[in-house]
From Swiss-Prot:
Belongs to the thymidylate kinase family. Keywords: ATP-binding, Kinase, Nucleotide biosynthesis, Nucleotide-binding, Transferase. This is Thymidylate kinase. Its EC number is 2.7.4.9. GO terms for molecular function: ATP binding; dTMP kinase activity. Gene3D superfamilies: P-loop containing nucleotide triphosphate hydrolases (3.40.50.300). It comes from Caulobacter vibrioides (strain ATCC 19089 / CIP 103742 / CB 15). The gene is tmk.
Amino acid sequence: MTQGFFISFEGGEGAGKSTQIRRLADRLKAAGHDVIVTREPGGSPGAEAIRELLVNGAADRWSPVTESLLMYAARRDHIERVIRPGLARGAVVLCDRFADSTRAYQGAGGDAPASLIAALEEHVLGGTVPVLTLILDLPAEVGLQRAEARGGAARFESKGLAFHERLRAGYLEIARREPDRCVVIDADAELDAVTAAISDVVVQRLGL
């Protein structure tokens, strides 16, 4: 059986990842592909339980190190129960956030040691990494305004503009270091333009 494709979507709060994932999923399904849409933290029952601990409560509820450990506990369950089985059956797995979110949120944003995050990646991911990562980029203040207007994961939104500016810089640095995997998409553009840009990249990179 043909191995599937693992595509992750990354970006700060209010970047529009969920909308763009849904649009890409609809296009791929219409073309006859088996598509799994999932998210992190979460995606499996165990990981969703951990998600509740992570996204609710005060901004300082967890330290960056503790957050990283919780994220990776959820991620491992998600990989074992959803991502790997999906890829094994040949599906296109579209994931709203993956390991780069830990690098950006807990690393660049929260100062968790890079050595800790690297060790977690090595031992937990076990080679399960996206073949393509789409980083939806926009100014931090614009993203926060969008997120506030829609409601949502208030714990991370409440961390303040400086945190989210570090977060954005962290994502752009990931893209700079890993251009073969990562593509930056201008998420401050019109909705349809963002969709078209994503579709173009997926066609060019993966032929989907």
